[in-house]
Amino acid sequence: MLNRVGVKSIMNKLVLSISALIVITSCLSLAPTFHKQIAFAQQATNLLTYENSSYGIKIQYPSHWEKQENGTKQGSATDAVTFLPPTINSNASLDISIDDISDEKGITLAQYANNSIGDLKQSFKDFKLISSNTNSVLAGLSAYKSIYTHTDENTTFKDLEVGAMKGDRVYILAYEAGLNEYDKYLPTIQQLTNTFQITN
């Protein structure tokens, strides 16, 4: 028969074992987050700055990503620059464009976002809107954010579009990737978006 001292000793060991198990489990659950934070920190040390005074934009991007300056115009919008990841055969990209809305005096952010969604429906096959809001932030300004999918040449793409108004311009960052790559590059895209500035 166990005496009180023996029971107390067993209980203490049991409590210590359970406590140790909780600590170990907590550490293991935090490991993926910790590794992600290390990856982001390493990536942040290898960022280059892209600045274009003509368009009044500035953004940081990973040094191993490709930068393509475009300057092509489609209607009232100008494609300023595109950033591409280094992965071979990747279809992911971050495109920055500036839309001149001087002919649309008085248009609100919500109206612009709705018009943009309407245009996308007309332009893309199998367009499906996942979410849309006008309470996001880009470069310190109120912004709209739309997430949607569409099909192009039998490939389904997922897109994230964020746009903010300043004066007679709307500054748009559009991230596009195949469904198999979208989540892979999303943290990097979010990091780039956070560095975006309007300089004029």
Task: Indicate where each model-derived feature is located.
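N-terminal "mature-domain start" segment
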Residues: 40-76
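Sec-dependent signal peptide cleavage junction
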Residues: 28-44
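Bacterial N-terminal signal peptides
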Residues: 19-31
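Conserved polar/disulfide-associated segments of primarily extracytoplasmic proteins
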Residues: 70-166, 170-172, 177-179
